[in-house]
Amino acid sequence: MLRARGPGPGALLLRAALGLGRRGRSWQRPQGQDTGVQVHNSLTGRKEPLIVARSDAVSWYSCGPTVYDHAHLGHACSYVRFDIIRRILTRVFGCNVVMAMSITDVDDKIIKRANEMNVTPASLASLFEEEFKQDMAALKVLPPTVYLRVTENIPQIIAFIEGIIAHGHAYSTATGSVYFDLHARGDKYGKLVNTVPSATAEPGDSDKRHSSDFALWKAAKPQEVFWASPWGDGRPGWHIECSTMASEVFGSHLDIHTGGIDLAFPHHENEIAQSEVFHQCQQWGNYFLHSGHLHVKGTEEKMSKSLKNYITIKDFLKTFSPDVFRLFCLRTNYRSAIEYSDSTLVEAKHLLLGLASFVEDARAYVKGQLTCGPVEEDVLWERLTSTKKAVKAALANDFDTPRAVNTILDLVHHANRQLRAVSKEASGPRSPTVFGAIISYVEQFFETVGISLANRQCVSGDSSTVTLRCVVDELVRFRLKVRQYALDTPGAAGEARKRQLQERQPLLEACDTLRQDLVTHGINVKDRGSAASTWELLDPRTRHQKPGDRG
C-alpha cells in the first residue's frame, strides 16, 4: 500500500510530544553540471533540474535485494525501470553513471528462512544472491558498478555507528543494542514524507528511550549469527547498512538515490538522518527517485511475498521475453503504480512483434526485396525530425517513457502506411534512404532502453552462428529458386499454363511445408511476392504469434 505523503493526527501529536515543529522542505539546489533533465525529486515533491557534481561520474546508490528468497516481478519492475533511466542518462544525456547497489545478506528474514531450511544464513544468502544476479541478467538489467554486501562491511558499519554516537544522536543500552535518538534529530527528521514514526507499544523489556527510536545495532540473540562490537556481540540494523556502504563509495554527498516507493519511509528517511548526522552536512542525498508498485489487476495490493500473490522472475520468463516485460514497464511512468495482467503483457508482446515486423519490412524495402508504390519522402523526413525532437523532450521531462514510446509508435504507423506492397514492378523513384534512417533511429531508441529489434540472426558473432546463418541463407535462396520456377511459365498461356502450374504444384507445396517446418525450429521465412524471400530467428516464446507474411 502506498504511504500518504502528509502526517496524520497521531504523527503531529507525536511531533508535538517530542518538541518537533512542522517540517518544511529545505532542499538545497546542488552546484555542478546541469544534465538537461528534470526529475521528480521526492525530497521536494516536484520536478527539479537534475544537477550533478560531475557528469563524468554521477554517483547513484540503489537499494538492492535482501537475499532470502526468489526475486519476483514486483522487484523486477523497480530494477528494470531504474535500469531504463540509467541507460537514458548514459546514452541520451551523456552521463557516466557510477552505481553502487547493496546486497543485504544478513537480517531477520534470512536468519528465519535459514533456520526453516536447516542451512546457514551465509549459504542461503549466497544461493539467492547468485539467483538474483542471474535474474537481473536475464531481464537485461545492467549490473551496478559495484555490489556491496553487508557482511563484508561490518567494521565500517561499527565505525559509522560510533560516529553517530559521538555526535550525540545515538545511544547504547545495557543489553548491547544501539539506537538512533530521533528526539536529538529534532525538526530535521521527515525530509521525505513530512512525518515521524507513529508511536507503537514496546515490549516490556524494551530499553529504548523513545518508542520511535530505531536500531543501529541489534544485540545478539541465542543461535543467531553475530559480530563483536564495542557494545557487545550483535549485528547491524537495516537502515545503517545503506548509509555506511553508500558513504564508503561516495563520501558525504550523493547525486541520486533510488528504490521502490515502499522504501521512502522509514528506510530512506532513516538513511538521511543517519548520514547527515555522521557527515555533519545539511543535505546528504540531492535526489531521491522512487518507483511505483506493481499491482495485481483488479486489486490495490502490491505484488509481494508477504501477500503470496507474486510471480517469480524465472516463471515469468518461461512465458514472456525480457523485451516484452521491458516494453510493459516503458508504457507507464516509473513513478506510477503499474497493473499486472496477462492481457497487458500480451498487448506489449503484440506491440513488440509489430515493431519488429515493421523493421523487417522496411529493411526489405531498402534492400529492394519489397516492391512498393511511390513514397512521400519529404513527409517522412519531416516526421522523423519532429519525432527525434519530441522523444528527447519527453525523456528530459522526468523520463517520460510512455510519451516517448507513443511518439515512436506514431512514426512507425505513418512509415508503415507508406510500405504499400504492390504485385507488379512500381514505376518512379524509390526512397530507401529515408526508410534506412527510420530503421536506424527506431532500433537505436529501443536499444537505448534495452530492447533489441535488430534481426536476431546477428546477435551473436561466434563462428558457429555465422556458419548457421550462411547455411540458412543458402537454404532460403534455394527454396526461392524452386518457388520461382514453380510460378514462372514463360511462353505458356491458357490451358497450357494452367496444366504447367498444376504439374508444378507439388513444388509449391514442398516450399510451404519447408517454411512451416522451419518455424518449428525458430526460423521464419517471408515470401515477398515472387521476387525475394527473407528470414529471421524467432523468440521461442513468441514464435506462434508472428504477424502474417507481407507480399
Swiss-Prot record:
UniProt-listed InterPro entries: Cys-tRNA-ligase (IPR015803), Cys-tRNA/MSH_ligase (IPR024909), Rossmann-like_a/b/a_fold (IPR014729), tRNA-synt_1_cat_dom (IPR032678), tRNAsynth_Ia_anticodon-bd (IPR009080)
EC number annotated for this UniProt entry: 6.1.1.16
Catalytic activity: tRNA(Cys) + L-cysteine + ATP = L-cysteinyl-tRNA(Cys) + AMP + diphosphate; 2 L-cysteine = S-sulfanyl-L-cysteine + L-alanine; S-sulfanyl-L-cysteine + L-cysteine = S-disulfanyl-L-cysteine + L-alanine; S-sulfanyl-L-cysteine + tRNA(Cys) + ATP = (S)-sulfanyl-L-cysteinyl-tRNA(Cys) + AMP + diphosphate
A Gene Ontology molecular function term of the record: metal ion binding
GO BP, one annotated term: cysteinyl-tRNA aminoacylation
SUPFAM superfamilies registered for this protein in UniProt: Anticodon-binding domain of a subclass of class I aminoacyl-tRNA synthetases, Nucleotidylyl transferase
Lineage: superkingdom: Eukaryota
UniProt entry keywords in alphabetical sequence: Aminoacyl-tRNA synthetase, ATP-binding, Ligase, Metal-binding, Mitochondrion, Nucleotide-binding, Protein biosynthesis, Transit peptide, Zinc
Binding-site residues, Zn(2+): 63, 242, 267, 271
Cofactor requirement: Zn(2+)
Primary residence: mitochondrion
HAMAP family given in the database record: Cys_tRNA_synth
Protein name: Probable cysteine--tRNA ligase, mitochondrial
Gene giving rise to this polypeptide: Cars2
